[in-house]
Amino acid sequence: MRILWVVVCVVLIFPFCVQAQRGWHAGLKGGISVPKLRAPSSSTNSYSDGFQTVVGPQAGLIAEYRFNSLFSLQSEFNYSTQGGEKNGDQRIRTTDFKAYIPVGVNLPQYLYGNFNNKISLVYLELPLMAKFSFPLSNKYRLAVYGGPYAGYLIKAEGEASGKSKIYTDPQKTTELKYNGFALGEVDFTRKEDIIDQLSKNNFGLQGGTSIEYATGRINYFFAVGGNYGFKRLQKDPNFGNNKTGGLAISLGLTTKL
């Protein structure tokens, strides 16, 4: 009988709690992104391998509909930086040096060198996430959230720096020669737009956790999360098989509308 009364009380009170908590909230956030270009674990393509993390800005607008104090749906419109850097061993297309290669000389498809290479990407992303919130005290709540996202590439730059000798083998034992003489060091320092080489659309999963502090109609939060892209970045798989992903750390606020 006691259990029955508890159930009746919950059934009677719950709708009022839901009504009190439900509604639209809007906000904004900003912070840093720590992305890395991922390559398959089985990859033997040196275009894909060896990228390390970089740091860039990220910011977004938030729209959240709260069904009750525990569950909500959250959508965002984010400016997200992605990319990576690789220093040291690099693979180079032989066609980039065709002016130095005498007619009739057969060379491998790729040449090799040592310099620095950085890929900088900017996406506009639209995630839709389920969010679960748990009270820690009267003012603080812990939230976890996750769901799919779609992204659109708006900027892509490749930046190289450094000088290197050019080799015809990955072990770097044989230098590229022109008229019988080694070509010597070549300056690779340059920046170029590479957006036409990449797929503009992307999709994947995004999620994270946050600590929220409520004061009046405004909630302040600190969030740590990340995203994991599913689509290959390069249009031509011969030039790599990387996917996006990384960590995001942000501060923000939302307010009840």
Language-model-derived ranges and their functions:
Residues R22-S72:
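Start-of-domain marker
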Residues W24, T53-P57, S120-L126, Y140, ...:
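Residues that define the transmembrane beta-barrel architecture of outer-membrane proteins
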Residues M1-K29, L251-L257:
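Bacterial Sec-dependent N-terminal signal peptides
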Residues K177-A182, Q197-L198, N202, G207-L257:
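Predominantly the C-terminal beta-signal and adjacent terminal strand-loop region
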Residues Q74, S80, S120-V122, F132-R141, ...:
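Acidic/histidine-enriched, beta-strand-rich ligand/metal-binding domains
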